[in-house]
């Protein structure tokens, strides 16, 4: 038993010295001789404890199968090989960046007059869209935004069109020629207005009322209810159901107040009867006002409801003709 243990210890120690990776030591004091402690620096692998009854060939075979890759372990706490490789790669990158920087520095120093030297790089200005001979880069900047836009977007000449556009000063100026024109009065409205003004003479007050469309337009302007007008043509014919009284007779009527008169203006038509051309009329206006309480209406004859100016403006502004 002791001979087998010694052979196992010698083979393990020899193998550890060859690899230079770790060593197997017996436990302190030699008290536990059956178990061996395997110490490793920089490797976390499975610990193999050889059996006392196993032969040396089986122990060697187990250690060789669990042996790690030589590049995976370092020599103790030495320098890490991966870090050295990364530093070498960084040096290669720094060299490549220095070469690119030198190539970029030589570009702005080039002028169109200098001859082309061997190994020097020259950038064609204008981009791939420029046709013809390539112009050399300027000393200020190789690719300026202004030149790029001018080459990409060509300027197209546009003809200057003269438009008749009024300026603001022309609108603000008030000249005599820009005054609003006075509306011309219709000739038929003038004839009607003259006929209404001259009620004394028969020739001036007569007009062809049935053939004129002024009749339909005049009644709404005067506020006359066209459904209740009388076209009988009798002289002095009053409206049906109207109680015609003089203003002084209305003073004794209870509940009558002149300021409460809200007008429904009607007319009494008069003219010559038997005319083939229709009724020739003169006008008389009546103010119809209600009585309080009974719902009856009193018609008050008023011949000057409208002033001449107001009546004239009502005629011409409402297009009676």
From Swiss-Prot:
Compositional bias per record (Basic and acidic residues), positions renumbered to this chain: 1-12
GO MF term set: clathrin binding
Listed Pfam families: Clathrin_bdg (PF15045)
Disordered: region residues: 1-85
GO cellular component labels: AP-1 adaptor complex; trans-Golgi network membrane
GO biological process, one term: intracellular transport
Biased composition (Polar residues): 53-67
Annotated protein name in UniProt: Uncharacterized protein CLBA1
Organism: Rattus norvegicus
